[in-house]
C-alpha cells in the first residue's frame, strides 16, 4: 500500500501536538496512520510512506510524534518489517526516523512511558501480545 502524507493527509503539516497546530503529527497518527498501518498489518502488506510532495516539508516533531506512536503501538520489530519510509528530496528525514525516533519510542514502549495527547481521540489500534486491539488507550489530555 502507498500513502503520501501531502496527497492523502494534508498539503501543509504542523508540529508535534494538536493543541499547537492543525494537521499535527498527533493528528496524522490518530486520523490516518494508525488505521492505514493496521490494515497493512492484518494483510501482512508493506506500507510505503511517501514524504515527498509538499512545499514546506516537515518539522522533525511531526515525524517523531506520528511514527513514534506507530512504534509504541505496534512495536519496533513490526514497524521495521512493514513500514518503508521514502523520500528522495530529504534523506535526512529517513535518517532522523531510523536513528532517533525508532530507538527512543521503542524504549518508551518497553518502559511503559505513554505518549501524550493534547486533545481527545477516538479509539486506535495497539498490539497486545501480538493481537491488535482497538480502544482509547490514553484518556488524559495533556496541557503540556
Residue ranges: model-predicted function:
Residues 8-99:
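Amphipathic alpha-helical interaction surfaces in cytosolic regulatory modules
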Residues 95, 99-144:
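A cross-taxonomic marker for long C-terminal extensions/tails that follow the last structured domain
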Amino acid at each position: 500500500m502507498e500513502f503520501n502524507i501531502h496527497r492523502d493527509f494534508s498539503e501543509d503539516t504542523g508540529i508535534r501536538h494538536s493543541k499547537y497546530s492543525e494537521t499535527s503529527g498527533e493528528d496524522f497518527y490518530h486520523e490516518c496512520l494508525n488505521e492505514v498501518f493496521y490494515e497493512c498489518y492484518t494483510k501482512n502488506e508493506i506500507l510505503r510512506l511517501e514524504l515527498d510532495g509538499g512545499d514546506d516539508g516537515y518539522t522533525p516533531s511531526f515525524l517523531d510524534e506520528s511514527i513514534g506512536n506507530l512504534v509504541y503501538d505496534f512495536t519496533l520489530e513490526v514497524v521495521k518489517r512493514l513500514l518503508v519510509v521514502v523520500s528522495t528530496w530529504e534523506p535526512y528525514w529517513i535518517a532522523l526516523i531510523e536513528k532517533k525516533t525508532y530507538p527512543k519510542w521503542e524504549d518508551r514502549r518497553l518502559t511503559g512511558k505513554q505518549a501524550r495527547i493534547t486533545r481527545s481521540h477516538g479509539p486506535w489500534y495497539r498490539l497486545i501480545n501480538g493481537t491488535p486491539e482497538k480502544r482509547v488507550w490514553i484518556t488524559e489530555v495533556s496541557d503540556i
